[in-house]
Amino acid sequence: MLSMFMCNNIVDYVDDIDNGIVQDIEDEASNNVDHDYVYPLPENMVYRFDKSTNILDYLSTERDHVMMAVRYYMSKQRLDDLYRQLPTKTRSYIDIINIYCDKVSNDYNRDMNIMYDMASTKSFTVYDINNEVNTILMDNKGLGVRLATISFITELGRRCMNPVETIKMFTLLSHTICDDYFVDYITDISPPDNTIPNTSTREYLKLIGITAIMFATYKTLKYMIG
């Protein structure tokens, strides 16, 4: 009985010590710590969440981004391997094509910005647009500006909710854009077709260009009608 009593006292004593230590720690913390203080996050922390974040959706999106990055990397590795296996002459032509495509892309982006600035500051009729585009094409012989013009009038067609005016605009501009310079670019990048007489090749290619722009008209009208 005595030993049991002593054991119980020892246990109670140890519990009292533990409780006292915990209370001392809490008192010390309450005296020295500002409870409103927000600890700074590490500068290199990438992921920061709030209570509204759906972690599962976030991780799913991250997985998609990672997979796309992996696919891009693998494709690039295969292309790099193929490029290294090509003859020197072939690689030199690829370099020339890259330079040309970069120039077309830069011209396209620059001319698109010019056209959007023009459209945002002025109000045009169909004939005004045709005259403006014709002036731009006369001052610039590049392919980039012609591609930019096609994109521009397609965007304008979507903003104009009058189908009749849209058709009129595309009809006028299809002939304006498909000029001799446009046909020359198509001729340079198209394989020769021996079934077409040389005398009618240019007319044929011009017709192809007009048809392509009219197809853009159809897609625009379909977008407008819904």
From Swiss-Prot:
The keyword Membrane belongs to this UniProt entry's keyword annotation: yes
Localisation per UniProt entry: Host mitochondrion outer membrane; Host cytoplasm
One annotated GO molecular function: protein sequestering activity
Pfam family, one: M11L
GO cellular component annotations of the record: host cell mitochondrial outer membrane; host cell mitochondrion; membrane; mitochondrion
Main location: host cell
InterPro entries, sorted: Bcl-2-like_sf, Orthopox_F1, Poxvirus_F1/C10
BP-aspect Gene Ontology terms: negative regulation of interleukin-1 production; regulation of apoptotic process; symbiont-mediated suppression of host apoptosis
Induction: Expressed in the early phase of the viral replicative cycle.
Highest taxon above the source species: Viruses
UniProt keyword terms in alphabetical order: Early protein, Host cytoplasm, Host membrane, Host mitochondrion, Host mitochondrion outer membrane, Host-virus interaction, Inhibition of host apoptosis by viral BCL2-like protein, Membrane, Modulation of host cell apoptosis by virus
Ranges where the record places region Essential and sufficient to inhibit host NLRP1: 32-37
Family from the record: Belongs to the orthopoxvirus OPG045 family.
Stated role: Plays a role in evading host innate immune response by inhibiting host inflammasome activation. Interacts with and inhibits NLR-mediated interleukin-1 beta/IL1B production in infected cells. At the host mitochondria outer membrane, interacts with the BH3 domain of host BAK and prevents BAK from binding active BAX. In turn, host apoptosis is inhibited.
Oligomeric and partner information: Homodimer. Interacts with host pro-apoptotic protein BCL2L11 (via BH3 domain). Interacts with host NLRP1. Interacts with host BAK.
Protein name: Apoptosis regulator OPG045
Natural source organism: Vaccinia virus (strain Western Reserve) (VACV)
Gene it is expressed from: OPG045
